[in-house]
């Protein structure tokens, strides 16, 4: 813990409160407690890539964590072999734009568009039952089957999540180990919103369960927030 009493071992982040709700039973109303000998806190960063990036940057300064794990739900691309109800552990997070996938737009060459998850965090989540997967972060939910197929093919991504790249980039800028555990709530495409509404709560709870099974392995005392 930091000299100011702020720093935590593990910071769990999510786009909005329902994705953290299953943690109240173990972290309490203040969303902070000691679990397995670790100081664990949970905070909301906002919905969508811009809000999540800004919200994460603010929480890193305020909470000074040793490690971060993003929680939430995602959609699986057709052909990924990943099913609704699975939990994935992010291996790589990629910023994706449909126009780029179509070949009618380009990201500037110096622009960072890919961030790898922290290897130890990935392995801990896999041991806890999550499946390693590559995550595409789009600006909006993909609700067209052909568009979803093109994005998956062009980026070799397995799942789609709106906030992952924003959180990962903010962590990378601060040198904070990043991981993500996401419950699969839907297939990406025309039925995405309908399926998500039906499954998002159970999918979010499954992601939380995976993290709680490996809390000690997700927070490293050797990787403190730079001061």
Named regions from a protein language model:
Residues 3-5, 35:
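Generic structural signal for beta-strand residues in well-ordered domains
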Residues 9-29:
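N-terminal beta1-alpha1 ligand-phosphate binding loop
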Residues 32-226:
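Glycine-rich phosphate- or other oxyanion-binding loops that anchor nucleotides, phosphorylated ligands
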């Amino acid at each position: 813990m930091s000299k100011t009493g702020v720093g935590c071992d593990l910071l769990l982040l999510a786009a909005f409160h329902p994705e953290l709700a299953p943690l109240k039973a173990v972290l309490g109303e203040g969303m902070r407690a000691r679990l397995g000998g670790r100081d664990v806190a949970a905070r909301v960063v906002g919905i969508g890539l811009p809000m999540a990036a800004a919200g994460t940057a603010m929480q890193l300064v305020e909470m000074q964590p040793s490690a971060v794990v993003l929680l939430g739900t995602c959609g699986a691309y057709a052909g990924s072999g990943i099913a609704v109800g699975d939990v994935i552990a992010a291996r790589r997070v990629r910023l994706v734009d449909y126009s780029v996938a179509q070949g009618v737009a380009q990201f500037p060459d110096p622009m960072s568009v890919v961030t790898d998850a922290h290897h130890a965090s990935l392995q801990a989540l896999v041991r806890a039952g999550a499946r390693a997967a590559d995550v595409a972060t789009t600006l909006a939910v993909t609700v067209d089957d052909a568009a979803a197929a093109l994005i998956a093919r062009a980026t070799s991504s397995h799942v789609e999540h709106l906030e992952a790249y924003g959180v990962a980039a903010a962590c990378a800028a601060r040198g904070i180990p990043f991981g993500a555990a996401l419950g699969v709530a839907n297939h990406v495409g025309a039925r995405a919103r309908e399926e998500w509404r039906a499954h998002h709560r159970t999918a979010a709870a499954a992601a939380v369960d995976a993290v709680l099974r490996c809390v000690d392995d997700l927070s490293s005392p050797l990787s403190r927030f730079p001061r």
